[in-house]
């Protein structure tokens, strides 16, 4: 009652609370909604998601510096960049965040909210759990993500911490994030080369997804139903898309889908039908909080880009980002500022290098 009742009334119970334990507890509310049908729990989850993503969240999708929720509108996320290196309890937090997003997608009837939940799940995956320092066989495990002015990925000082368990659970859940079935068809939530086979009525259908996303903008789906069948295929169109996404079927344009919604394709599908989705990506800036709009993260598509091996702290130096960043290698961009070259790469590509996550907008 201390969590779900205030959330259902639109209140914010999070400030000062332990971050992970409260987010993972939200999944019990999802189970209550699915079992009892009480809309209180559905409303509570929707409000919790809104609060987490608009008042607590770093650009990576992480939250809870020092494992504690901040008080919104006081600039505390910004302050934490200088006061701690423990910005997100990553394996546990990503496990809780992705589990919550899956429940919300399952129970959403609003295509815009469905897309929003999928967008954030994708953000969390790429920039937190997939961006940790790789564990080793000796029990050295990542625990916290660090977003300090000059940051470094390190292991937790003790072997086999609690997060070593949730890291494995999160990895095991990767396939659960890709596709969602419904009585009318299939929803594609994430874009990664994969294959799914399912029963739709009396037909068996296989969908094969091929892509180099997010390094590239295009995703291809090939369908293999064992008989002609009508069903609906929906594709998430991220809100960050630089323009409308284009969809072709068997090479013929069929729809331009607006960012932040779903592309809905209902037709009579046959063996070998091919769907091609192109999602335009471009750089954008995201402020750390509402008190510090000049302190920004550099984003492209679902990915947070960081400055690699900075020779000095860049957080206070005004930079004209995104400016005219030059593409010098796959997912690697560069620009010259004040006579020196700065390299920008996705946070998930960093292992042993130092990096900067937030910059001052020029």
Language model region names:
Residues 3-28, 62-90, 137-161:
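Carbohydrate-binding/catalytic loop surfaces
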Residues 33-46, 53, 104-119, 227:
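Structural helix-adjacent loops and short alpha-helical linkers that scaffold large soluble proteins
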Residues 45, 118-224, 249, 258, ...:
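C-terminal beta-rich recognition modules with glycine/proline-rich loops and embedded aromatic residues
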Residues 230, 272-274:
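Extracellular Ig-like/FN3 beta-sandwich strand-entry sites
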Residues 263:
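Conserved nucleotide-binding/hydrolysis modules and their immediate coupling elements
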């Amino acid at each position: 009652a201390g969590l779900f009742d205030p959330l259902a009334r639109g209140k914010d119970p999070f400030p000062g609370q332990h971050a992970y334990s409260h987010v993972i507890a939200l999944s019990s509310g999802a189970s209550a909604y699915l079992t009892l049908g009480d809309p209180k729990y559905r409303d509570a989850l929707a409000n919790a998601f809104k609060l987490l993503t608009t008042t607590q969240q770093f650009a990576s999708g992480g939250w809870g510096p020092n494992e504690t929720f901040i008080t919104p509108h006081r600039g505390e996320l910004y302050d934490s960049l200088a006061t701690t290196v423990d910005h997100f309890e990553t394996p546990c937090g990503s496990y809780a965040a992705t589990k919550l997003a899956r429940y919300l997608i399952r129970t959403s009837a609003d295509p815009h909210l469905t897309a929003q939940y999928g967008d954030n799940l994708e953000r969390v995956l790429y920039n937190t759990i997939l961006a940790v320092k790789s564990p080793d066989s000796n029990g050295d495990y990542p625990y916290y993500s660090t977003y300090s002015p000059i940051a470094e990925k390190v292991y937790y000082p003790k072997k086999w911490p609690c997060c070593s368990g949730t890291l494995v659970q999160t990895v095991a859940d990767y396939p659960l994030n890709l596709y969602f079935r419904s009585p009318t068809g299939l929803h594609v939530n994430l874009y990664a080369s994969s294959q799914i086979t399912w029963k739709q009525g009396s037909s068996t259908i296989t969908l094969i997804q091929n892509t180099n996303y997010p390094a590239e903008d295009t995703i291809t789906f090939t369908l293999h139903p064992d008989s002609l069948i009508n069903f609906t295929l929906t594709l998430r169109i991220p809100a960050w898309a630089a323009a409308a996404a284009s969809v072709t079927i068997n090479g013929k344009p069929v729809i331009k889908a607006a960012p932040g919604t779903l592309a809905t394709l209902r037709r009579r599908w046959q063996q070998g039908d091919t769907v091609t989705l192109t999602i335009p990506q471009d750089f954008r800036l995201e402020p750390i909080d509402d008190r510090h709009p000049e302190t920004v993260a550099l984003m492209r598509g679902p990915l947070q880009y960081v400055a690699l091996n900075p020779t000095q702290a860049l957080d206070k130096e005004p930079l004209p980002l995104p400016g005219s960043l030059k593409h010098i290698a796959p997912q690697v961009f560069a620009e010259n500022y004040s006579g020196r070259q700065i390299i920008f790469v996705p946070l998930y590509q960093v292992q042993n290098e130092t990096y900067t996550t937030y910059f001052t907008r020029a």
